[in-house]
A protein has these predicted regions:
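A short beta-sheet element
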Residues: 87-88, 101-167, 175-178, 183-187
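Non-catalytic DNA-recognition/assembly elements of restriction-modification systems
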Residues: 1-18, 35-69, 193
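Short, well-ordered beta-strand elements within core beta-sheets of diverse protein domains
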Residues: 45-49, 147-151, 188-194
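Conserved helix-loop functional segments at active or binding sites
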Residues: 64-68, 132, 169-173
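Short coil/turn segments at secondary-structure boundaries
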Residues: 29, 71-78, 176-178
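Amphipathic alpha-helical coiled-coil/heptad-repeat segments
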Residues: 1-28, 154-155, 159-162, 166-173, ...
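Sequence-specific dsDNA recognition surfaces
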Residues: 39-47, 56-76, 84-119, 137, ...
Length: 194
């Protein structure tokens, strides 16, 4: 999808500028770090961050985190409807997930009604290939390999996306790979500069 590719490229550029270089706009609209913004060493993150930022956990910023689930495969009527059933392959390479290879019927999705994800939820793979992320662009559900943040505060969407992206990139750089599995509790405990 060309639009998705363009949005992803723009997001990557913004991510690097704001969250790696910390050159987000300051109060005067100038790049924070390049304009002499104060930086302090953060022991938890093992890097310099802008002065005044705290280090809360993801789960303290946004409380509604949903771990996906697969409805019973024994009942074929649970599948083949209009509700995207998002997996890691559907997210990979897509900033926004518009469709999925598999779908759920209303019956299948309603059998696990607490697993519905509203538009704009951030889905993050936490089993197998960890750190693959994308925003669902339709009402959807995911399988159990994915934790999703349902946002109470719209302003946290991009921030948490980029913070998690940086977290997973740093984890991979330090170890050569990212963990094989991450529970919902471990995911909610990720510390970010905020």
């Amino acid at each position: 999808m060309p639009i998705n590719d363009n949005l992803e490229a723009m997001a990557k550029q913004l991510y690097d500028y704001w969250f790696v270089q910390f050159d987000f706009p300051n109060e005067e609209g100038k790049p924070y770090k390049s304009s002499g913004g104060a930086m302090v060493w953060n022991e938890k993150l093992k890097r310099e961050i802008p002065q005044g930022l705290g280090t809360p956990k993801i789960g303290d910023i946004e409380k509604n985190i949903i771990t996906g689930k697969t409805p019973s495969c024994a009942d074929e009527d649970n599948f083949g409807g209009d509700i995207p059933f998002v997996t890691i392959d559907d997210i990979r390479g897509n900033l926004f997930v518009f469709e999925a290879q598999r779908t759920l019927s209303t019956k299948g999705a309603d059998s696990q009604e607490k697993k519905y994800l509203p538009i704009g939820s951030l889905s993050v793979s936490c089993i197998g290939t960890i750190g693959v992320m994308g925003f669902v662009a339709r009402l959807a559900q995911t399988n159990q390999q994915i934790n999703s943040i349902v946002f109470e505060h719209e302003y946290n969407k991009e921030f948490l996306y980029f913070s998690l992206k940086l977290y997973f990139e740093n984890a991979k750089a330090k170890t050569g790979n990212v963990f094989a599995n991450m529970s919902k509790e471990e995911f909610a405990s990720i510390i970010v500069a905020y």
